A protein has these predicted regions:
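Non-catalytic DNA-binding core/recognition domains of DNA-processing enzymes
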Residues: 1-56, 100, 171
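Flexible interdomain linker/hinge and immediately adjacent N-terminus
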Residues: 49-79, 132-138
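Catalytic-site neighborhood detector that most strongly recognizes the C-terminal catalytic loop/helix
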Residues: 195-223
Length: 223
């Protein structure tokens, strides 16, 4: 697309979605189409639709949603850390990376942060925040972390928008954490417990066993 086309597309785009999203589209339109990148595919489809080029729009195949096997590399995660430094989502990103919990849970921790619920070990600097939040099959009992937390006025949509603006997809942080923990030899059941994937019929004793195991294994990842 020419610069004039990109400007016209952008002005039309902001009528429907946020400025950040439209900026992201324009950035992708400055590069060749990458069929393996969902954002790139989306940007080019939006552009061709806006242009009225239905043939080109149809030609871009959206990948069938199968299992997403992408796991970011350590180098990629380090890049993300550099990107968030000094931004309003830096602490949130660190919490996601340290704990492996979902974005909704990390947002809840920071937006309702209560120091009374945060137990920190002065010897290891590892903290365990009691969240005890269930919805459906999702249960986050504890959030393990290292960074010092503080209450922040952050909402899920605002956080997601800022992270997307930096080209960071929260679900991949979660996948990175799970993969790294398993690589370090942390049992899958403990990884599930740390990430809030605990079955509803769990017995109290087994739950306490998992908490004990989580305390034992988490330092392997925290280091």
């Amino acid at each position: 697309p020419t610069e004039a086309e990109l400007i016209a597309f952008f002005h039309e785009c902001v009528k429907k979605v946020s400025i950040e999203t439209c900026k992201t589209y324009v950035n992708y339109l400055r590069k060749p189409l990458d069929v393996n990148n969902k954002q790139s595919v989306l940007a080019w489809k939006k552009y061709y639709k806006w242009k009225g080029d239905i043939e080109a729009w149809k030609a871009i195949k959206t990948k069938k949603s199968g299992v997403d096997l992408r796991v970011p590399s350590e180098a990629e995660v380090r890049e993300w850390l550099a990107k968030v430094k000094g931004t309003k989502v830096e602490l949130l990103f660190r919490l996601l990376l340290e704990s492996g919990v979902r974005l909704t849970e990390a947002v809840k921790v920071l937006s309702e942060y209560d120091p009374q619920s945060d137990a920190c070990d002065p010897n290891t600097n590892i903290c365990i925040y009691t969240l005890n939040w269930s919805r459906g099959s999702k249960r986050a009992f504890y959030v393990f972390h290292v960074s010092r937390l503080e209450r922040q006025s952050v909402t899920y949509n605002y956080a997601k928008k800022l992270l997307h603006g930096l080209d960071i997809e929260p679900k991949y942080i979660r996948k990175f954490v799970a993969t790294k923990m398993l690589e370090l030899g942390i049992p899958a059941e403990v990884v599930d417990f740390l990430q809030g994937r605990t079955p509803s019929q769990i017995l109290t004793k087994h739950y306490l066993d998992l908490l004990t195991l989580a305390k034992k294994y988490y330092p392997l990842y925290a280091e």
